[in-house]
C-alpha cells in the first residue's frame, strides 16, 4: 500500500527535483577549460625545460645522472669537454612520447638544470614534434624561468 501511495504522488520525482534544487544554487565546481584554467600545484610535473644561469650560460654540466635514472630511457645526452676543462652537452634530447613524467630526472640533477615546468598544453600532431632537442628545452627554460624559479623555491624545503 505504501509503495502505491509513493508512486501515486510521484515521490521519486519530487525527491529528485528537491536534490536538483539543493545543488542548483551552490557555486559551480566545473570550469570552462580553454578560457578558464584551474590552479596548478607547485609540484606539478609538466613540459620539460633546461635552465640557464643569470649570465646566460646553460646549467647542465653533462653529468648524465638524469639519463641514467630515467626509467623510460627517454633522455639521450652527448657531451664534450671544453677548453677550460668543464663538460657541456652537445646533444640533449628528450622523447616526450616515452617520458612518464615521474620527475626523477629533476631530482637527480645536482644543479637544477632539467626541470619539469608548469605547461601542460603541448600536444602535437606528429611524433617528431614531441622529440625535444637542446634548443627547444632551453627555449622552454627561458620562457618559464620565473615560474620555474618560484616553483623550485617553494619546493626547496622538502627536497
Curated annotation (Swiss-Prot):
It is found in: Cell inner membrane. [4Fe-4S] cluster 2 binds at residues 70, 99, 102, 105. It comes from the Bacteria. Its main location: membrane. NDH-1 is composed of 14 different subunits. Subunits NuoA, H, J, K, L, M, N constitute the membrane sector of the complex. Its cofactor is [4Fe-4S] cluster. NDH-1 shuttles electrons from NADH, via FMN and iron-sulfur (Fe-S) centers, to quinones in the respiratory chain. The immediate electron acceptor for the enzyme in this species is believed to be ubiquinone. Couples the redox reaction to proton translocation (for every two electrons transferred, four hydrogen ions are translocated across the cytoplasmic membrane), and thus conserves the redox energy in a proton gradient. [4Fe-4S] cluster 1 binds at residues 60, 63, 66, 109. GO terms for biological process: aerobic respiration. PANTHER family: NADH DEHYDROGENASE [UBIQUINONE] IRON-SULFUR PROTEIN 8, MITOCHONDRIAL, NADH DEHYDROGENASE UBIQUINONE IRON-SULFUR PROTEIN 8, MITOCHONDRIAL. InterPro entries: 4Fe4S_Fe-S-bd (IPR017896), 4Fe4S_Fe_S_CS (IPR017900), NADH_quinone_OxRdtase_chainI (IPR010226). It catalyses: a quinone + NADH + 5 H(+)(in) = a quinol + NAD(+) + 4 H(+)(out). HAMAP family: NDH1_NuoI. Transmembrane segments: none annotated. Gene3D superfamilies: 3.30.70.3270. It is an enzyme of class 7 (translocase). SUPFAM superfamilies: 4Fe-4S ferredoxins. Belongs to the complex I 23 kDa subunit family. The lineage of its organism: Bacteria, Pseudomonadati, Pseudomonadota, Alphaproteobacteria, Rickettsiales. GO terms for cellular component: plasma membrane. This is NADH-quinone oxidoreductase subunit I. GO terms for molecular function: 4 iron, 4 sulfur cluster binding; iron ion binding; NADH:ubiquinone reductase (non-electrogenic) activity; quinone binding. Residues 51-80, 90-119 form the 4Fe-4S ferredoxin-type domain.
Amino acid at each position: 500500500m505504501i509503495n502505491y501511495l509513493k508512486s501515486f504522488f510521484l515521490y521519486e520525482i519530487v525527491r529528485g527535483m528537491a536534490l536538483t534544487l539543493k545543488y542548483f544554487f551552490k557555486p559551480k565546481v566545473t570550469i570552462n577549460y580553454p578560457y578558464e584554467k584551474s590552479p596548478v600545484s607547485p609540484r606539478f610535473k609538466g613540459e620539460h625545460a633546461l635552465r640557464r644561469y643569470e649570465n646566460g650560460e646553460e646549467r647542465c654540466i653533462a653529468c648524465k645522472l638524469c639519463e641514467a635514472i630515467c626509467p623510460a630511457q627517454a633522455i639521450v645526452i652527448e657531451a664534450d669537454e671544453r677548453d677550460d676543462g668543464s663538460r657541456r652537452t652537445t646533444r640533449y634530447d628528450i622523447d616526450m612520447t616515452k617520458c612518464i613524467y615521474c620527475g626523477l630526472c629533476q631530482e637527480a640533477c645536482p644543479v637544477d638544470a632539467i626541470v619539469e615546468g608548469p605547461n601542460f598544453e603541448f600536444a602535437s600532431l606528429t611524433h617528431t614534434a614531441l622529440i625535444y632537442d637542446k634548443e627547444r628545452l632551453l627555449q622552454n627554460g627561458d620562457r618559464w624561468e620565473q615560474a620555474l624559479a618560484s616553483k623550485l623555491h617553494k619546493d626547496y624545503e622538502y627536497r
